[in-house]
């Protein structure tokens, strides 16, 4: 029986009974973690969509998942765990947001200016 629904939240992926685990499920859990982190934990723009292969470890060792955008995690449970894919999506979003925040683009320069202005107002 496939999961009927799952919820994105800070407690991980909650799901109902399932007998099999397919690539579509992994992509959904990864996207769930990415969307959660992008919406609630980052201050930069939302992470754009990306393709993700559930069978793409970063090494021959089975305990590593390639999360995309030059990020990887060591899996906590096993490679077919929804929680690991959720965390992988969150890791991707954090790495993307950090890279985006540190790049000197005009949109980010405005953010930096407003942040400095905010700190100056606090000090004064």
Swiss-Prot record:
It comes from the Eukaryota. This is Putative uncharacterized protein YOL014W. It comes from Saccharomyces cerevisiae (strain ATCC 204508 / S288c).
């Amino acid at each position: 029986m496939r999961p009927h629904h799952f919820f994105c939240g800070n407690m991980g992926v909650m799901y109902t009974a399932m007998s099999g685990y397919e690539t579509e499920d992994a992509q959904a859990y990864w996207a769930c973690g990415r969307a959660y982190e992008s919406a609630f934990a980052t201050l930069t723009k939302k992470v754009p969509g990306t393709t993700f292969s559930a069978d793409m470890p970063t090494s021959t060792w089975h305990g590593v998942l390639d999360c995309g955008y030059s990020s990887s995690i060591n899996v906590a449970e096993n490679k077919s765990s929804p929680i690991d894919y959720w965390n992988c999506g969150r890791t991707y979003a954090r790495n993307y947001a950090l890279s985006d925040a540190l790049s000197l683009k005009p949109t980010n320069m405005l953010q930096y200016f407003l942040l400095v202005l905010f700190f100056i107002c606090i000090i004064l």
